[in-house]
Regions:
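Juxtamembrane transmembrane-helix boundary motif
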Residues: 1-19, 33-39, 44, 65-151, ...
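Alpha-helical transmembrane segments of polytopic integral membrane proteins
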Residues: 33, 53, 57-60, 112, ...
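A small-residue-rich subset of transmembrane alpha-helices
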Residues: 54, 182-198, 208-221
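Transmembrane helix boundary and interhelical junction motifs in multipass membrane proteins
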Residues: 23-32, 157-167
């Protein structure tokens, strides 16, 4: 495999995934997988494993950045994470009964629509209004929404991050920065679980492709997270929306090519 060609493909895969993770808590699998499959001819199962492992550090560093800026709800994030992990298994079993193309198309289409939503109808919730909800109610909501997110994450595969962002902002009433921070915090653990299982079953991936994807995704996620935490809510909504729309269209094209 030509090293320069690999470098270019992994750079753009990592850039797209990193920006999506840092700005919107998007799963790297949605961007990296189709690029690796289309341009480097990597086995789809292994491509998802590489993408999920790239997600781990990118999400962890993004969560740290959001947490440092007090834009992370760890308590409810942990509650939701348990529900997500359990019901991901349930969703994964159900997904085995449905054509994979249907699942992939759903994930990409949802990314595109969510981007349009942030542009047309920005999330302008404040932390003050978030504080009006009781801790008990928030915990119950976190469990129920975690069940829904986990099921869809297991069913769709690369749509968990987008579902988390949609539900955290639209259902739980989180302001955008806290929603993304909490989303990447949860994704750190879900991605690690997914990557470990992929490598345990499918074996270790091509070391060069794997390392390059991890590095590029981490660098761009770090850049995006720092910018996102400094941006005004209105600017962040617009930038997040544009990135999701562009990534949604790009992934649709890559999926067609593959």
């Amino acid at each position: 495999m030509n090293l320069l060609y690999t470098l270019i493909a992994t750079f753009f895969a990592g850039m797209g995934a990193g920006l999506g993770t840092g700005f919107a808590g998007m799963s790297a699998a949605a961007v990296i997988s189709p690029i690796l499959i289309t341009f480097l001819g990597i086995d789809p199962y292994m491509a998802v494993g590489i993408a999920l492992s790239s997600d781990v550090l990118a999400s962890a560093f993004s969560a740290y950045t959001y947490g440092k800026n007090k834009n992370l709800d760890i308590r409810n994030g942990l509650i939701m994470m348990v529900s997500v992990l359990i019901f991901t298994v349930v969703g994964s079993y159900i997904s085995s009964l449905v054509p994979s193309t249907t699942m992939g198309n759903f994930s990409v289409f949802m990314t595109f629509l969510l981007g349009i939503k942030f542009i047309v109808k920005p999330v302008m919730t404040t932390k003050e209004s978030m504080g009006n909800v009781s801790a008990r109610k928030r915990a119950i909501q976190s469990v129920l929404c975690g069940i829904l997110i986990g099921f869809i994450c297991g069913f769709v595969g690369a749509g968990g991050g987008m579902m988390m962002l949609l539900i955290l902002t639209s259902v739980l009433g989180y302001e955008l920065k806290t929603a993304v921070g909490t989303s990447v915090f949860i994704m750190t653990f879900t991605a690690f679980t997914g990557a470990a299982s992929h490598f345990a079953i499918g074996g270790f991936p091509d070391a060069t492709v794997w390392i390059l994807c991890v590095i590029f995704t981490l660098v761009w996620a770090r850049i995006a997270a720092v910018f996102a935490n400094k941006a005004t809510p209105k600017t962040l909504n617009r930038v997040t929306g544009v990135i999701l729309v562009v990534l949604g269209i790009a992934v649709m094209i890559f999926s067609r090519l593959s």
